[in-house]
């Protein structure tokens, strides 16, 4: 079903689905992460630009809507750019399912009435503590995540996230 949702997402962008071993592997890994009984409470999709991470996140969102998981949140699973997470921090902490798109693009800190906040870190820590399912896409490597967000977040990622690394070439031409 996830493969069909991925193909439909590609078609919705007026693109032609290009079957590849890398894409099939990523879809299978995500399906396994979603259906295998595990202590993991999230999935992180890592890789360079344009190789299908966002398409897979949107395919999952559309599949959840199709399967009637709409009652969990307004649209199954909100997908928010990491910068939007910084602005909607309170909401992002509590939704049952959340996808954070392009983690790493946002400024690490934000000034709020004189207080320095680290919104993405705060959201991730809260979701970790509450064991709320989170899907993340990023162009950052594990080392870069550790440098930007700190050892604690990197360590929690290792515990809470199933990691899917996208190795394929960019589909954007």
Regions found by a protein language model. Give the residues of each.
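Hydrophobic positions on the alpha1 helix immediately C-terminal to the Walker A/P-loop
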Residues: 56, 60
């Amino acid at each position: 079903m996830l493969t069909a949702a991925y193909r439909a997402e590609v078609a919705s962008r007026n693109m032609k689905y290009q079957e590849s071993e890398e894409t099939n592997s990523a879809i299978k890994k995500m399906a396994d992460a979603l259906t295998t009984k595990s202590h993991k409470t999230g999935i992180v999709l890592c890789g360079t630009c344009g190789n299908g991470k966002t398409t897979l996140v949107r395919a999952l969102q559309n599949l959840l809507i199709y399967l009637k998981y709409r009652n969990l949140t307004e649209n199954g699973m909100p997908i928010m750019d990491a910068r939007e997470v910084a602005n909607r921090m309170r909401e992002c902490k509590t939704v049952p399912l959340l996808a954070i798109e392009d983690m790493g693009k946002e400024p690490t800190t934000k000034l709020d009435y004189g207080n320095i906040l680290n919104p993405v870190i705060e959201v991730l820590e809260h979701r970790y503590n509450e064991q709320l399912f989170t899907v993340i896409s990023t162009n950052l490597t594990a080392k870069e995540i550790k440098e930007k967000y700190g050892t604690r977040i990197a360590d929690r990622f290792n515990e809470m996230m199933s990691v899917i690394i996208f190795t394929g070439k960019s589909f954007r031409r």
